[in-house]
Structures are given as structure tokens and as C-alpha cells.
């Protein structure tokens, strides 16, 4: 069995005697390796830094502290430890890529984004720029890079730093297109994941899970595949994902350990302390630990994961055959990335600044600043100083009308998690006081349902007859809100809100109307998902249990319908009275589209492609049309409904649905969130299934397997594999890819037409380019 050192070809184990002084704060237990080509990396970084400074001057950007953000330290270069086994001919370009990523991140304004080991690390506020300027830079870079990648159309960026960054990516892909494209896919996935959630009011376990999913770990690993020239399939990566995720978790928590003072300082200066996303901060805020206690916990958690990784790797090695050599290199590279990053962070100026404006006393103000009662961290003693701290009580469990267990704390906390809906409730004068306050309504608390004070006056004894003649009392909304609050708390990319903002660049809707339209679309979308999951018998939604698995079918339906009432109320508050007619019109279309889907499934009737498109335009396209029509109705500029924009949104709805159909069968990430080929379990007539039934020699076999099952049972795994094999034989997935490529080209043509009529919209262009099939299908 090869040892870890045997796998390394271009590096040697670190000699701690070579480092003076030795980093005092280094605690990782992983072995650390050092590249034999350190000088080349340092030289390449120095030259790139000089060019970047000149480009910043040309662009008028304030970047006078690059020395704190660069990869080079007084002991060496980040890459010599993080990517020690980089093949010699790629060392210089890899050094440039790392510096480019750090410098770019250094300009980002502090808005609550994550700080990551491999790509986005803490930055100095004095070097950051405004959100508006950063948005302009990002769009300039994104359009140039994605246009070239998706369509081969080369567009030179306007900013000098973007010209440098785009050239780095071009060189990166040119050296190795296979791993280069894979790297870009992971980079985009990392950026998408960062948009999904913040970490306020989150448990430690959930925090670690979220950080692994949203951090730059997979991005850094994909760079490692490029640096080390590792050729590994997605299936092989998936087979050892449990080990790479374990390594990433340790590295991410290590980053939290080293970066906390820096991150706190950034957020304190920018007034965003409520959005700091760091494990030390979470343990202080949600669990009441001091900074020292929290850092000790983080350190233990890192070491635990490192030991588990080493044990897991050794166990895997004992049973791995000679054909797994590339997987072994992949795993060792991942471990080296984490160990090298930890060594670098233990002494890099980026994490050990002496010019912070805040102190340990300032950071201590986070202790106990949770939104509710403090949590208890399993496996660790409570904070030493518990004076004045209220521990979170254990939630009592109740059963709903369908016998499903639900926790009362989930109900009581729903308004905390539900940002959009909670904002609506606060602005609605028809709603009474909530969550334990006395008013005309009852409340649902950890002690159970509490009667309103007025009603209690009529019920002085259990045998009182007064309750039968008491005045009307409006019931509390907590129980009705709870299922919606749950689905609204799940991670989401918020793409519809983003699209609304981008369309508004054309339509110029007043801020108050735009906010209401966002609420309308958001609530309508989530309520439709609650109903869809019931109608499709889906067990998962966004990688978490579907709403009805917690709250039961009856309560979930009631909550979804209750949200429709809220949506109608919001629509009536828009300025243009025509908005209610628009809403009714598109809601009618949405339900008609859904009825087609359900009808075909119930009667096992395969629709034609033309019928499928009609269903998509009504069901999926309904929300897109609703967005556009409401924006147009509320627009502050006199402009008729634009047909070019309407076509753009129609094609966008089709692309979303067909992409979803394809990913359901072909994406490992989708499988983790919804299950393996879930559309087969639902009996859904997706585009791939319609194509298969139109081309296979044995359509009856497929329909018999799909529709002659015991209700409520999933299609057996072997049958799913059979259907996928049949799709392979008739090239169904290849056809789906061709449709997506064609549809995306038409989308971009429709955007060109819309821009010719309405003016350029870089935000919409970047968003649509980012959805393109090149990254999706690679």
C-alpha cells in the first residue's frame, strides 16, 4: 500500500527547522508538504502584483494594501504548501490564479459573504469598493468570460483588472481544457451557493453543513486537479465524497479560527455585524461562549475531522485496488490543500493584522446576542460564565391532524426564519400581535395554545357556559404560518428576486411596488412548491424534507392556500388596479398548466412535444409572465407591454423547465437534493421521457413500470437504471442537451432584440450567460 508521501512527486515533507520563527498558532495534525518550485511561484506572484497595481491605478480603484492580500508571506508562498505537488510547468500560472482570486476578493464590499480557505478570504475594508462599483466590475468580467465560454464570442472587458483576470482564465483553460472547464463549473457553483443563506439563528451542526456546501472547498479541489494533472470522473469523485467533504469541513473551520478577528473588524466598520458568517461568531452569539472558549471548540472540531479523515483514508486504502491510483492522488491532493492552507493561515499577514480598529472587548459584545434563547452544544461543557444567560428549552413535540410529528419551537420560530412573509405581516394592519403577546388573538407558544385575554375573562371555570356566547375572536396565524415558514427557511438562490431587480433596470418601477412584487412572486412560488411536493409525492425539497413530511398533507395545503390570501392582499396594495386582473389571469394559467401535468400522469397518457410546451408555458412560464406584467403595470415610465421582452421571458421559462428535466436525470447535485431520478418516481412526463417513449422500441415496458405500481412506492433502482440505459440507446439525453443549446442560443438572440428596443442590460445578459449549457453540461 502506497503511503501519502509515495504519491507526491514534486514536493517533500516540510522541515520545520527551515522556518524561523515557526508559526506559533499552527495546530493542524495533517502532514504538511512543500513544493520544490517555491521560487518560481514567488517570482510569478511578484510580477502579477506589480501589473495588478498598475491596472488598479488605470481603473481608478483604491488598492493600497495588496501586500496583506497576496499569497507571499515571510516564510514562502501559499501555493508551495496548499498545492505542493503542482506539476512544474503549471506552477507560475497557478500562483497568478491564486493572487488574482485573492485580489479580486479583496475589492469586494463586506456584505455578509463567506470567508473561505481557497478563494474568498477576509479583506480589508479600506481596500474594498462600493457595492455599485463592484457590481459593475463583476458584470464586466462575467459578460466577457461567459460570452467566450458559452458562445465563443470574445468580448474585451472595459476594466484593466478584468482584462488581466480574463486572460488568466483563458490561459488556465488553454493549458488543460478538461480540468479547466471543470474548475469554472465549481467556481460558478461556489458563487451560487454563497447566495443561498446566511447563518443567523442556526445551530452548530446546520452551520457546518451549510459552510461545506457554500464554501470554496470544491473550487479549491478543482484547482488542485488542474495543478496536479489529475484525471478523475464525476463517479469516482462521488465514491469518495464522504472523505473530501470531511476534509473541507476541517479546512473551513480552520479558516473560521484564524479569520475571526479580521472578519469582525470588517463587519464592525461596515455596520453589518448581524451578518457575520463565522463559526467562532456563531458559537459566541448562539451558544454564549467567549472568544477563547469558541476558538478552543473550533480547534477540537478541526482535529477531530482531521483524525477521521486519516482513519477513513487508511481504511479506503486497505481495500482499494491498483486501478484506484488516480483516486488516491485526488484524495492526497485534497488533504495537502487543507494542511497547506492551515499552515499558511497560521502565519499569513492576511490573517494576522496588527492594524485592526477593534479589540477583544469589542468582539466580546457578540456573546449571547442570539435572536432567541441560547442553544446547548452537545458534547461540550456550557460556557463558564452563565450568569444572566437563558438556555434554550427542549422543544416539546405535538402531532398534527395527520399524525406527523412537529416541534412547537419550529412553529414559534417561523416568523424569525420567514423574512419576506414576516415583513408582510408587520406591514399588514389586519394582523394582530404575534408570538406570546397579548391581544385579540390567541398565541401558540412552547406551553401550547394560549387563549386571548378577552376570551379568558368569559371562561372563569371549565364548566362556564359563557364560552358559547363569547364575542368573535380571530384565531392566531402562527400554526397556519408554520409550514410556509419552514419552506421559506430552506436555502434558495433567490434567482427570481434577482431577475426582478435586473428587469427593473428597464422598467423603472417605484421601490415600494418592486418590493411588493418581490413578495408576491416569492410567496406564490413557495406556496406552489408546497402543493407541488404533495401532488408529486416528493420527499425532498432543496435537499431537505418536504414541508408535508413535517406538517402533514392537510395542514400544508391549508397553509399554502392561506399564503394565497396574503398574496392577493399584496396585489391589491399595488398602485395600478389592473394588477389584480393580471394576477388572476396568470394564476389561472398556472393552474391550467399544472392540471395538464397531473392529467397526463393520472391517465398515463404521453403528451406530444407541442402539448408539453403548452404545459410549460402555462405552469413554469406563468410566474415569469406575472413578474413582467406586474412590473410593466407599475412602471413609472410610459411604455406599452414589450413583445420582445415577453418573448425573452417565455423562452426563459422553457429553458428553466427543460434544464430542470435534464438535471433531474443527469446531475449528481440534483440527486442529492431531490433523489435519484425523482421524475421517474413521480411518473412525470418530462421532455426526456417524452423523447424516449417516442423513440424506444419498447414504450409499453416503460409505461408499465412507471404507472403500474402500488401507490406511494418509488420506482425500483434497477428499473431506473434500465430506463436510463434505454435513454442512452436512443440518445435521449444527447437530444435534451441539443434542445438546451438551441434554446439558449435563441434566448441570447431574444435578449439582443430586447436590448435593441430597450437599451443594454448587462445584468440580464450575465445572468442568462451564467445559465448557459456549457457549464451545465461539462
UniProtKB/Swiss-Prot annotation:
Family recorded in the similarity comment: In the N-terminal section; belongs to the terpene synthase family.
The cross-references to PROSITE patterns, in alphabetical order and at most eight, read:
POLYPRENYL_SYNTHASE_1 (PS00723)
SUPFAM superfamilies, alphabetized:
Terpenoid synthases
This molecule's function is given as: Sesterterpenoid synthase; part of the gene cluster that mediates the biosynthesis of aspterpenacids. Performs both prenyl transferase and terpene cyclase activity, converting isopentenyl diphosphate and dimethylallyl diphosphate into geranylfarnesyl diphosphate (GFPP) and then converting GFPP into preaspterpenacid I. C22-oxidative modification of preaspterpenacid I by the cytochrome P450 monooxygenase sttB then leads to preaspterpenacid II. It has still to be determined how preaspterpenacid II is further modified to produce aspterpenacids.
Task: Name the reaction it catalyses.
Answer: 4 isopentenyl diphosphate + dimethylallyl diphosphate = (2E,6E,10E,14E)-geranylfarnesyl diphosphate + 4 diphosphate; (2E,6E,10E,14E)-geranylfarnesyl diphosphate + H2O = preaspterpenacid acid I + diphosphate
**What keywords does the record list, in alphabetical order?**
Isoprene biosynthesis, Lyase, Magnesium, Metal-binding, Multifunctional enzyme, Transferase
| Record EC number | 4.2.3.-, 2.5.1.-
From what organism does this protein derive? Aspergillus terreus
**Gene responsible for this protein:** sttA
What are the binding positions for Mg(2+) 1 in this chain? Answer: 105
What results from gene inactivation?
A: Abolishes the production of the ophiobolin family sesterterpenoid.
Task: Give the pathway.
Answer: Secondary metabolite biosynthesis; terpenoid biosynthesis
Q: Which GO terms describe its molecular function?
A: geranylgeranyl diphosphate synthase activity; lyase activity; metal ion binding
Q: Where does substrate bind?
A: 105, 255
| Name of protein | Preaspterpenacid I synthase sttA
